[in-house]
Structure formats: C-alpha cells, structure tokens
Design a protein with these regions (language model features):
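Functional cleft and adjacent loop/helix regions within the main domain
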Residues: 14
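Intrinsically disordered, low-complexity regulatory regions enriched in serine/threonine/proline
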Residues: 1-11, 23-140
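Catalytic phosphate/metal-binding cores of nucleic-acid and nucleotide-processing enzymes, i.e., regions
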Residues: 140-171
Length: 171
C-alpha cells in the first residue's frame, strides 16, 4: 500500500507528462529527463516541522550526482487559498500537507485539479531547462531534405523529379 506522499506524487507525475519513467517511493518521486539526467521530487517542510509546504526538485547526473536543486513552495505557486466559512482563515491558507499525529493529509484546503496542473506546469518549466532539446527539435522541427537532380538537360523534368521525391519523403 502506498503512503500519502506517494499517492500525491504519483497523481502529479505518474502520467509521464512532466517526467519520464516515474517511480515513487516514500516521500520522493524519481524520473528521467534524458540519457544522463534524472530528477528526484520530494515534499519537504521549509518552515514548520510536520508541515510539508514545498516540493524539492533535485536534478541528478546518473554518474556525477546532483546538478541543481530547486525548492518550489506551494504557496508561491498556488497562492493563499480561501477557506469559506472558517473564521480561522479569513485571509486563506497556503496549501500544505500536515502530519496529524502520524496521518498525513492536506491541511484545511485540498488542491483542485487546476491547482495540480499549475504545480505540474511549474515543475515542468524548471525541468525544461535541463532537458536535451536535440531530440525534441528533431521530432518537432522543420525537416530539410536534399534531393540531387541535374540542372542541365531538361530542367523542368528535373524539377518535377525533385518535387516528387520530396513528396515521397514527407508522406
């Protein structure tokens, strides 16, 4: 049975849209960025023990260890969230997970699907800095093909030949 942190991390990153080959264990989720880079994502407490209010992202070189570390506070990403009808939180609450005597749960405010997507986007933007863009450009960028045709003789026929070959390549 997975724990609360694993469930939340899997919900955020298990679809492989932000990280490849995600694996969640304990308070951490691991994934692949490219051939040599991995990422570890953890819920951490930044201010009060037992209040997990941030995600710590560690980019790891699989041979040489840590490359970069970033802490993304949920309150910075999502802002304070209103708790209607609760006089204790008139100005809202920064989303965080708390340790309620050994039971971990969201405190006062449970993130919406839009909130989860906002967190995914923030994490994705940070990790994009480290991704190998060569493969992406190859897949999504314009294609350039050289087709050799003699420019002497029947030039019109040679141009027609080149156009036909180009259409074959791009279909």
């Amino acid at each position: 049975m997975s724990n609360f942190f694993e469930q939340e991390l899997w919900y955020l990153f298990g679809d492989e849209q932000v990280i490849d080959t995600p694996y969640c264990s304990g308070q951490s989720c691991y994934g692949t960025l490219d051939r040599d880079l991995r990422v570890r994502i953890q819920f951490i407490s930044t201010h009060i023990s037992g209040q997990y209010d941030a995600l710590k992202l560690t980019v790891l070189n699989r041979i040489n260890g840590p490359v970069d570390i970033q802490v993304l506070k949920l309150g910075d990403i999502l802002g304070k969230k209103p708790i209607p009808g609760n006089p204790n939180f008139r100005e809202g609450v920064a989303p965080h997970i708390w340790d309620n005597y050994g039971k971990f749960e969201w405190y006062a405010y449970r993130p919406t699907e839009a909130d989860y997507e906002t967190v995914r986007q923030a994490v994705g933007r940070y990790l994009d800095v480290f991704r190998d863009r060569t493969l992406e450009r190859t897949r999504n960028g314009p294609k350039l093909v050289y087709i050799c045709a003699p420019l002497r003789g029947d030039v019109e026929q040679n141009i027609t030949f080149a156009k036909e070959k180009a259409q074959e390549v791009f279909q």
